[in-house]
């Protein structure tokens, strides 16, 4: 249960950018963007969204929680796969409308639901005038059918 609450962002830009208060600026849907990297090697793992409850639970428990826009519900990362994200550090950007989580991933060391370490396993390029995707990391860290059989 969430006990932590967040004050409204200050009107003064200087206070927002240099003051000591963490006052996240949630968007009109009540969400803030979360960029997630590996605390050890800095690899980009995923981008997700948090509502106030997910952010508070993350701060209170030290385990990453997010808000699923497609499922419209709170979820603890790794609750199905076992790839729980232990939060090592949280940073916010200058105007507090995005956060950066540095995490250690338990389980299979995979963040993506496809079984890959990162959700960013494809590059975007142009081939014969068409935008194309190229898979650059096809290593699966777990068997999807086995891990998600009960989900």
Swiss-Prot record:
Q: What is its EC number?
A: 3.5.4.19
Residue ranges with Polar residues bias: 1-13
List of residues binding Mg(2+) = 93, 95, 97
Query: Which prosthetic group or cofactor does it need?
Result: Mg(2+); Zn(2+)
Q: Write out the catalysed reaction.
A: 1-(5-phospho-beta-D-ribosyl)-5'-AMP + H2O = 1-(5-phospho-beta-D-ribosyl)-5-[(5-phospho-beta-D-ribosylamino)methylideneamino]imidazole-4-carboxamide
- Which Gene Ontology cellular-component terms appear in the entry? cytoplasm
The superkingdom listed in its UniProt entry is: Bacteria
- The signal peptide stretch is none
Region entry Disordered: which residue ranges? 1-20
CC cofactor note: Binds 1 Mg(2+) ion per subunit. Binds 1 zinc ion per subunit.
Ligand binding (Zn(2+)) = 94, 112, 119
The pathway to which it is assigned is: Amino-acid biosynthesis; L-histidine biosynthesis; L-histidine from 5-phospho-alpha-D-ribose 1-diphosphate: step 3/9
Location(s), subcellular: Cytoplasm
| Gene Ontology MF terms | magnesium ion binding; phosphoribosyl-AMP cyclohydrolase activity; zinc ion binding
UniProt similarity note: Belongs to the PRA-CH family.
Its subunit composition reads: Homodimer.
Role noted for this protein:
Catalyzes the hydrolysis of the adenine ring of phosphoribosyl-AMP.
Q: What is this protein called?
A: Phosphoribosyl-AMP cyclohydrolase
| Organism whose genome encodes this protein | Sinorhizobium medicae (strain WSM419)
The beginning of the lineage is: Bacteria, Pseudomonadati, Pseudomonadota, Alphaproteobacteria, Hyphomicrobiales
Gene for this chain: hisI
């Amino acid at each position: 249960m969430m006990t932590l609450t967040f004050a409204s962002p200050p009107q003064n830009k200087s206070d927002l950018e240099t003051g000591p208060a963490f006052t996240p600026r949630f968007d009109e849907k009540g969400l803030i963007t979360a960029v997630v990297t590996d605390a050890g090697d800095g690899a980009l793992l995923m981008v997700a969204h948090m509502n106030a409850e997910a952010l508070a639970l993350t701060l209170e428990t030290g385990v990453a929680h997010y808000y699923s826009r497609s499922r419209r519900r709170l979820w603890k990362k790794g609750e199905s796969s076992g790839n729980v994200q232990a939060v090592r550090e949280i940073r916010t950007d200058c105007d507090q409308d995005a956060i950066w989580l540095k995490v250690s991933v338990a389980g299979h060391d995979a963040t993506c639901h496809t079984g890959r370490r990162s959700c960013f396993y494809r590059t975007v390029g142009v081939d014969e005038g068409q935008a194309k995707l190229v898979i650059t990391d096809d290593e699966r860290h777990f068997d999807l059918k086995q891990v998600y059989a009960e989900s």
